């Protein structure tokens, strides 16, 4: 098998060969002889089936295996010619040509490799920014939020239920005049305006008085988790027993112990310092995500030029196109089915954004190496576990699902990006002036 292989640029290569179908047939017969020693076919002793019987039973599978062996050899030999290793390949090689004619299979294959990315002088593109300032008012407001969070509920003297109040009430729901499972409770406590109940329920309780009974008409969302209720009209019969409010306490020693469980000697000064740092970190995260990171990304993508691995780029275009599919109208989708040129043209609209995304992936990876930023396996597992806890899922199953579906590299890249930008904008501040707001 004569092979031609050459680099089209530093990140891509094209290889070609002509495979005689006779060589595939030879490989099929070779595999059939090996298979005959292992399989059991009715009418023959184990391992004694003739090759003809094996070919009759397994010809399609043997042909596929033979072609795969030959194609693997094609890839291996192409890499030798190119002076590349298998672990340098990005994505799966793609056959751009496959023509079978007159006993010859004419094959062309595209391969992509990690590009050479030079990031010399990237520091000069880091945008200037002002360190966010935290005011006393913001600290006091955040402390009040914590105090409100742990404050006990007490019976209120209020006579009319308002937004922000806690209602203690009985309710029973009906769909088509029939009660449904899980639609009834007594002495239930709900913060009005919290959005914990289906749309319309909490608003329907506003203005109720103690011991008042009221029918509240609502509609279950179309995507409601209980399929038998999704999209259905319902009536809830409600009786209000009590209006409750939270009584905010003082920031005394006992409260500080609750709010600072890991602190040996909690104090108001330490808590305020902790809150101040938390607010500053939140402001900094917002500044990074909304302003600094997009600005930095645009600049380095524009200024650092390198060859793009075409296979990875095409995969990213496909991914972005698939993600956008649900936003297209029925008319557009119908037109795409009829007009392939329109489909191709629409897909190409995602090319520029895909180029930026792929370039950023390599730039982030290279800059992270330069700054010695890494994501450990423990950090990766912890991030997946925390996501599972947040959504009430089994963390071990969630991790296994991510591993099986190949999502872990995506999570790892997101963590690497977060760590990198936090590092960049904590060490390379070009303007130490504070933000006056």
Swiss-Prot record:
Consists of 3 domains; the N-terminus binds the ribosome, the middle domain has PPIase activity, while the C-terminus has intrinsic chaperone activity on its own. The keyword Disulfide bond does not apply. It comes from Campylobacter hominis (strain ATCC BAA-381 / DSM 21671 / CCUG 45161 / LMG 19568 / NCTC 13146 / CH001A). This is Trigger factor. One of its GO terms (molecular function) is peptidyl-prolyl cis-trans isomerase activity. Belongs to the FKBP-type PPIase family. Tig subfamily. PROSITE patterns: FKBP_PPIASE (PS50059). It is an enzyme of class 5 (isomerase). GO terms for cellular component: cytoplasm. Its EC number is 5.2.1.8. The gene is tig. One of its GO terms (biological process) is cell division. It is found in: Cytoplasm. Keywords: Cell cycle, Cell division, Chaperone, Cytoplasm, Isomerase, Rotamase. It catalyses: [protein]-peptidylproline (omega=180) = [protein]-peptidylproline (omega=0). The keyword Cytoplasm applies.
């Amino acid at each position: 098998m004569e092979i031609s292989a050459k680099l089209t640029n530093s990140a891509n290569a094209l290889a070609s060969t002509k495979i005689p179908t006779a060589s595939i047939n030879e490989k099929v017969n070779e595999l059939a002889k090996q298979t005959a020693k292992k399989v059991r076919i009715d009418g023959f002793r184990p391992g004694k089936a003739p090759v003809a019987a094996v070919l009759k039973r397994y010809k399609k599978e043997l042909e596929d295996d033979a072609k795969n062996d030959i194609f693997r050899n094609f890839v291996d030999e192409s890499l030798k010619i190119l002076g590349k290793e298998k672990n340098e390949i990005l994505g799966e090689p793609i056959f751009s040509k496959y023509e079978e004619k007159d006993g010859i299979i004419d094959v062309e294959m595209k391969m992509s490799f990690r590009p050479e990315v030079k990031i010399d002088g990237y520091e000069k593109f880091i945008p200037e920014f002002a360190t966010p300032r935290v005011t006393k008012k913001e600290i006091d407001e955040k402390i009040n939020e914590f105090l409100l969070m742990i404050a006990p509920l007490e019976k209120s003297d209020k006579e009319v239920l308002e937004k922000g109040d806690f209602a203690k009430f009985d309710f029973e729901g009906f769909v088509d005049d029939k009660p449904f499972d899980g639609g009834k409770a007594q002495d239930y406590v709900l913060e009005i305006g919290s959005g914990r109940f289906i749309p319309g329920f909490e608003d329907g309780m506003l203005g109720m008085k103690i011991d008042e009974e009221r029918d509240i008409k609502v509609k279950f969302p179309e995507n409601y988790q209980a399929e038998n209720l999704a999209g259905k009209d319902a009536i809830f019969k409600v009786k209000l027993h009590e209006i409750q409010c939270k009584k905010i306490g003082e920031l005394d020693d006992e409260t500080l112990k609750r709010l600072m469980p890991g602190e040996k000697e909690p104090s108001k000064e330490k808590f305020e310092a902790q809150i101040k740092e938390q607010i500053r970190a939140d402001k900094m995260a917002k500044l990074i995500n909304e302003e600094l990171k997009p600005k930095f990304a645009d600049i380095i993508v524009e200024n650092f030029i390198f060859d793009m691995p075409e296979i990875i780029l095409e995969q990213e275009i496909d991914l972005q196109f698939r993600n956008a599919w649900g936003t297209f109208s029925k008319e557009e989708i119908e037109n795409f089915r009829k007009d392939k040129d329109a489909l191709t043209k629409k897909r190409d609209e995602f090319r520029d954004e895909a180029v930026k995304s792929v370039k950023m992936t390599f730039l982030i990876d290279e800059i992270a190496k330069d700054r010695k930023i890494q994501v450990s396996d423990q950090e990766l597992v912890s991030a997946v576990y925390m996501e599972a806890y947040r959504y009430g899922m089994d963390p071990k199953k969630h991790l296994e699902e991510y591993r099986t579906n190949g999502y872990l590299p995506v999570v790892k890249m997101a963590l690497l990006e977060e760590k990198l930008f936090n590092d960049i904008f904590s060490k390379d501040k070009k303007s130490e002036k504070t933000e006056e707001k």
